């Protein structure tokens, strides 16, 4: 499909999005206005053109799709273990390689390409250059967002909830080293794009922030455990993208294009699941094109929810997947604050 065809499809999809099927969805009347704005307004068409440019960039798509979704539970083969052992010998003076488990290095062995040693050396150099020191607590979400409060959009529907938040059972654990609650072995993270202000924080800072947390999620938090709901960590992440208060003004395709290639290359196979809600017709229209571009093994990791009952549906799905402790921690953190009674 050509770039022009994709853009045309995006515009048509927005104009006719009320006819598209939703999972568990009952569409609010405001979606008609959102679809019309996206399809006809100057700002809406500009944003869709940016999305189209992103989806039309073959090198970008090829750089993120091979190693985006998490691996299965297949044990390492003899050949893979031999390659890892050989790389360890060649990189015997590399601190990151020496401190990484075989499970961590296995992700790179399976990420494709020849010369595992060279690829491990490259990601080790990237880590030493990009990721801040582990003990630099300024990169904790709580501290980072407090220090940069003026660089995020005010969103009454979200109250004081931060742009990103690890889900932990006890509020007093927030900002510390305690491992987040696990969803099928993956650390659970909430992302709230309604707080995003495009351009307020540069891409390099975003990369350093996410990489600092990614190193913990894929390394330290994959080992050990401190209770029944925290056992079984496998070094992956599951996202809840709470789109409460979000609109086209918060969407930042340019930032995604800057961040995703580096993150998927240096944290391969790290996405376990992603829940995105509430979805309006504009997002669904974009997603209808995304599904044509990305392989099904990637899009299958995403669950899209909409309608007035999306919070209850998501909470119940999480309860069925990993129990009431995780579901009870998630429920007061998603949706408008006036509905949940929480601003934390």
Label for each model-derived stretch:
Residues 18-344:
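Basic, amphipathic alpha-helical/coil surface patches used to engage anionic, phosphate-bearing ligands
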Residues 4, 8-11, 15-21:
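N-terminal chloroplast transit peptides
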């Amino acid at each position: 499909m050509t770039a022009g065809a994709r853009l045309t499809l995006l515009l048509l999809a927005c104009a006719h999005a009320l006819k598209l099927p939703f999972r568990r969805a009952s569409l609010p009347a405001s979606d008609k206005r959102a679809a019309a704005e996206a399809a006809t307004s100057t700002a809406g068409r500009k944003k869709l053109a940016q999305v189209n440019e992103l989806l039309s960039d073959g090198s970008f798509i090829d750089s993120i799709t091979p190693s985006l979704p998490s691996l299965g539970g297949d044990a390492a083969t003899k050949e893979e273990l031999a390659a890892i052992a050989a790389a360890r010998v060649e990189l015997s003076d590399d601190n990151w390689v020496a401190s990484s488990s075989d499970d961590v290095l296995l992700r790179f062995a399976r990420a494709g390409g020849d010369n595992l040693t060279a690829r491990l050396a490259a990601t080790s150099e990237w880590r030493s250059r990009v990721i801040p020191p582990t003990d630099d607590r300024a990169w904790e979400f709580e501290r980072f967002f407090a220090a940069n409060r003026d660089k995020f959009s005010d969103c009454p529907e979200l109250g004081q909830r931060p742009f990103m938040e690890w889900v932990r059972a006890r509020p007093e654990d927030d900002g510390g080293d305690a491992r987040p609650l696990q969803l099928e072995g993956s650390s659970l993270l909430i992302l709230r794009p309604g707080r995003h202000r495009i351009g307020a924080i540069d891409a390099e800072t975003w990369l350093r922030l996410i990489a600092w947390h990614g190193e913990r999620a894929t390394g330290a938090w994959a080992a050990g455990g401190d209770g029944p709901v925290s056992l079984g960590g496998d070094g992956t992440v599951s996202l809840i993208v709470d789109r409460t208060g979000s609109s086209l003004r918060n969407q930042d395709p340019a930032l995604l294009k800057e961040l995703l290639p580096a993150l998927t290359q240096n944290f391969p196979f790290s996405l376990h699941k992603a829940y995105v809600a509430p979805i309006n017709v504009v997002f669904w229209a974009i997603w209808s094109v995304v599904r044509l571009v990305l392989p099904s093994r990637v899009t299958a990791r995403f669950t899209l929810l909409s309608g007035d009952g999306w919070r209850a549906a998501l909470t119940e799905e999480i309860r069925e997947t990993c129990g009431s402790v995780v579901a009870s921690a998630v429920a007061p953190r998603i949706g408008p604050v006036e509905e949940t009674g929480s601003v934390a």
